[in-house]
């Protein structure tokens, strides 16, 4: 099954779960995603403050996630680019801001996997999970790129790195596969 076919199937699953999806075809196929998530702190408080030095002090903002999925031609694995926005409009551009959003176990994985750079789905930069880490994950799984569950398994890795930010896409895929 081609990567484009897998992206189209993934887009159907995500759309059913309320994730906005758009297939963009430049020189390559890129699936653009958007979703919203509200993060709770350990006390379920609803606090959001922005410090003077612009480092996010964050308990429970509404986070809007923009993401792009493409096939990395160099590493031959899917690549996940993303840009979170606090309360709909404030882009989170500092590593400290991203780490404040992640669960403890995800922070450890994210430390080695996250980078920021040019995003092929936009004219700007975005965060991304480095494809060499993704390649290591697939080598451990020993799964073929043609396997119909390839992208679903890859999303589980993305979720390990970015939990709880990616919970809505995991739920959408899980719900679609159960129905």
UniProtKB/Swiss-Prot annotation:
It comes from the Eukaryota. The active site is at 132 (glycyl thioester intermediate). It holds the Pfam family Autophagy_act_C. Keywords: Autophagy, Cytoplasm, Membrane, Nucleus, Protein transport, Transferase, Transport, Ubl conjugation pathway. It is a peripheral membrane protein. GO terms for biological process: autophagosome assembly; macroautophagy; mitophagy; protein modification by small protein conjugation; protein transport. It is found in: Cytoplasm; Nucleus; Preautophagosomal structure membrane. One of its GO terms (cellular component) is nucleus. Its main location: cytoplasm. Its EC number is 2.3.2.-. InterPro entries: Atg3/Atg10. GO terms for molecular function: Atg12 conjugating enzyme activity. Forms homooligomers. Interacts with ATG7 and ATG12. PANTHER family: UBIQUITIN-LIKE-CONJUGATING ENZYME ATG10 (PTHR14957:SF1). Belongs to the ATG10 family. E2-like enzyme required for the cytoplasm to vacuole transport (Cvt), autophagy and nucleophagy. Acts as an E2-like enzyme that catalyzes the conjugation of ATG12 to ATG5. ATG12 conjugation to ATG5 is required for proper localization of ATG8 to the preautophagosomal structure (PAS). Likely serves as an ATG5-recognition molecule. This is Ubiquitin-like-conjugating enzyme ATG10. It comes from Schizosaccharomyces pombe (strain 972 / ATCC 24843) (Fission yeast).
């Amino acid at each position: 099954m081609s990567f484009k076919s897998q992206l189209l199937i993934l887009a159907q699953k995500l759309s059913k779960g309320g994730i906005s999806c758009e297939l963009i075809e430049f020189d390559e196929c890129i699936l653009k995603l958007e979703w919203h998530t509200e993060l709770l702190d350990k006390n379920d408080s609803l606090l959001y403050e922005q410090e003077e030095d612009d480092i996010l002090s964050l308990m429970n903002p509404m986070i809007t996630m923009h993401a792009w999925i493409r096939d990395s031609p160099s590493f031959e694995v899917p690549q996940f680019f993303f840009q979170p926005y606090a309360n709909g409009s404030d882009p989170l551009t500092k590593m400290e801001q991203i780490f404040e959003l992640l669960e403890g176990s995800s922070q450890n994985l994210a430390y080695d996997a996250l980078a920021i750079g040019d995003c092929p789905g936009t004219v700007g930069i975005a965060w991304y999970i480095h494809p060499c880490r993704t390649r290591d994950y697939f080598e451990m799984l020993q799964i073929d790129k043609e396997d119909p569950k390839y992208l679903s398994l890859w999303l589980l890795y993305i979720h390990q790195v970015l939990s709880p930010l990616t919970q809505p896409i995991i739920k959408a895929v899980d719900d679609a596969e159960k129905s």
